[in-house]
């Protein structure tokens, strides 16, 4: 019996050493990959989403994919940047401009056109940067139709000098709907335009059970333009852009124009923006929140308790109450200008 246990312990010891050897080798392999220098991947011709996907599949963490001022069209499959432990896709940049090593100035843009056949981007990796890209004609429908332009479950997404246009999300069943952009985590937008996106829900839900929006994320917006976006619902809340998950959110130097949120038998508010955080040096012009049961407020801006709004201008916005803005419980509003805002109920400029 003693010899049996000695043999058993010897086997266990060998097995444990082998396991540690395999795990150690795997970790070393990952460290070597992570330490490797970043590379450029060039796509040199017009093509399809499959060409962009092939570039992403080749890329490793830290690489830059240059689309080199080309146009790529979709035919039913979205572009995916997978996340997870072994994807090795974190910190990838997808740049629509021409590679500077090939004479690019950094001002060129590439177009990703889904042709209304699919969502454009589905991003699971973290610290992904999209820059100099026109993201257009994305379409997504069904329950929880989130992000016809860009959907991200990864953290720290960056969009720089991008346009998200003509993207449409819709649902006839339960769930939220977001047309241009939806992220579960932090997003940084700079010099971006969100234009002519449409989010609709025809599911006759219990009042305000779900939300229909142009976009939802936490983080910051700087030097952006948000215009001509449309949100419509039956029963669900209809809102423009929502940035409410953190008091550190910031929106600055951004123009919101001609955005429309409407709800039948539900609540419509913040047709341009609903925010928790700081809003500064922004312009809100001709935005409108509408509800057939007089549950509309904040034709332009709805800011949450503890938020600060300063140096902003509100012109020609419309809602039942608080045509320009409403704030809840507490907040600070200073050095702002209000011109020709119209409340069909009360609070032409401000409602609390």
Task: Pin down the residues of each PLM region.
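Secretory targeting signatures
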Residues: 1-39
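N-terminal extracellular ligand-recognition/capping segment immediately after the signal peptide
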Residues: 47-49, 53, 63-92
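Extracellular beta-strand/beta-solenoid scaffold signature
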Residues: 76-83, 114-122, 141-151, 168-182, ...
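Right-handed parallel beta-helix
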Residues: 68, 129-139, 156-168, 186-200, ...
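Right-handed parallel beta-helix/beta-solenoid
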Residues: 30-54, 71
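Right-handed parallel beta-helix/beta-spiral solenoid domain characteristic of secreted/periplasmic
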Residues: 75, 89-143
């Amino acid at each position: 019996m003693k010899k049996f246990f000695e043999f058993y312990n010897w086997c266990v010891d060998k097995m444990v050493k082998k396991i540690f050897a395999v795990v150690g080798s795997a970790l070393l392999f990952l460290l070597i990959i992570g330490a490797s220098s970043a590379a450029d991947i060039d796509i040199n011709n017009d093509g399809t989403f499959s060409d962009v996907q092939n570039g992403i599949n080749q890329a490793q963490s830290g690489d830059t994919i240059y689309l080199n001022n080309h146009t790529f069209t979709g035919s039913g499959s979205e572009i995916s940047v997978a996340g997870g432990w072994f994807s090795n896709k974190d910190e990838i940049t997808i740049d629509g401009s021409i590679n500077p090593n090939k004479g690019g100035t950094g001002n060129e843009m590439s177009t990703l056109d889904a042709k209304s056949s699919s969502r454009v981007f589905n991003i699971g990796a973290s610290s992904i940067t999209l820059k100099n890209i026109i993201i257009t004609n994305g379409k997504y429908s069904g329950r929880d139709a989130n992000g016809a332009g860009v959907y991200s479950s990864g953290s720290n997404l960056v969009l720089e000098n991008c346009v998200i246009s003509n993207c449409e999300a819709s649902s006839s069943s339960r769930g939220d709907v977001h047309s241009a952009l939806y992220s579960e985590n932090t997003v940084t937008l700079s010099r971006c335009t969100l234009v002519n996106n449409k989010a609709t829900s025809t599911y006759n839900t219990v009042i305000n059970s779900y939300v229909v929006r142009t976009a939802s994320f936490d983080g910051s917006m700087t030097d952006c333009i948000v215009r001509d976006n449309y949100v419509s619902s039956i029963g669900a809340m209809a809102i423009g852009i929502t940035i409410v998950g953190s008091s550190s959110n910031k929106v600055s130097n951004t123009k919101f124009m001609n955005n429309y949120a409407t709800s039948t038998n539900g609540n419509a508010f913040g047709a341009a923006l609903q925010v928790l955080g700081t809003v500064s040096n922004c312009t809100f012009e001709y935005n409108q929140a509408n509800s057939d049961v007089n549950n509309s407020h904040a034709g332009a801006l709805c800011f949450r308790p503890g938020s600060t709004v300063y140096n902003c201008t509100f012109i020609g916005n419309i809602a039942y109450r608080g045509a320009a803005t409403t704030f809840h419980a507490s907040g600070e509003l200073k050095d702002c200008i209000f011109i020709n805002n119209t409340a069909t109920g009360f609070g032409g400029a401000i409602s609390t």
